[in-house]
Amino acid sequence: PLGVKQGDVIGFSGNSGSSMGPHLHYELRDTRTQRLYNVVSAGIIRPDDDLPPRIMRIHYIEVDTVQGIPVHSRPESYAVVRSAGGSYRLTREEPVGAGRKGYFVVEASDRRNGVGNTFGLWRLALSADGKPLFEYRMDGFEQAQSRCCDAVSYYPLQLTSRNEVIRAAQLAQSPACFYPVMEERGIVRTEAGQTRRIRIEAWDDCGNRSQLEFDILGRTASFRAEADSAATALTP
């Protein structure tokens, strides 16, 4: 490790023309484990920020299993509008239709005072009827888990979105360290005709919070995938 103190010159930086000017990236790690720290949530750096995260929209994806192979429906998207402060609501009044098993995807973004940059969420939680089902939290991770960071996102939507797109469910290979709360991998179960209350909360790493609440209603007809006799199942 290189020891430095305030006022030391640690290097000189140029500009290739694409970075808007010379700048420095840095990170703090635990020496023994090489675990990366979130320096803002840990209180090491305190930026000026009283702006709660922005919840842009949500998506619902129904899931099923065919002959042991997991399948899913296309995402159903719902617009969101801010009602007051950090409180949000859906633009529709009627409940969101839900199948027997499914999960939600949340598109959100965050800003800080005085800068035009956008930032990711620190924490996202989902509960159904007051019972916590899912929580994602980014306090840091070990270097070996860097390749798993995109596992928390819903990548098909993340590719074209300018926001952070977080899957409120755990993929099979996604590290458990990202999820301090996880019930049934985040799957929301809904019986036909059953009404449930969903609450989604989003925090930034300065402690600002936004929330969205809405009802879901169990459909009588659910997503059912059928096996394709002409298809070949490939496994890694």
Task: List each language-model region with its residue ranges.
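Surface-exposed coil/turn segments at beta-strand junctions on protein surfaces, enriched
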Residues: S19, G97-G99, N117, R189-G193, ...
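Hydrophobic/tyrosine-rich beta-strand signature of extracellular beta-sandwich/beta-rich modules
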Residues: R196, I200-A202
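Short, well-structured beta-strand-loop connectors
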Residues: P1-S13
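Surface-exposed loop/turn motifs at beta-strand-loop junctions within extracellular Ig-like
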Residues: G11, D30, D110-R112, A202-C206
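Active-site loop architecture of trypsin-fold serine endopeptidases
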Residues: S13-E27
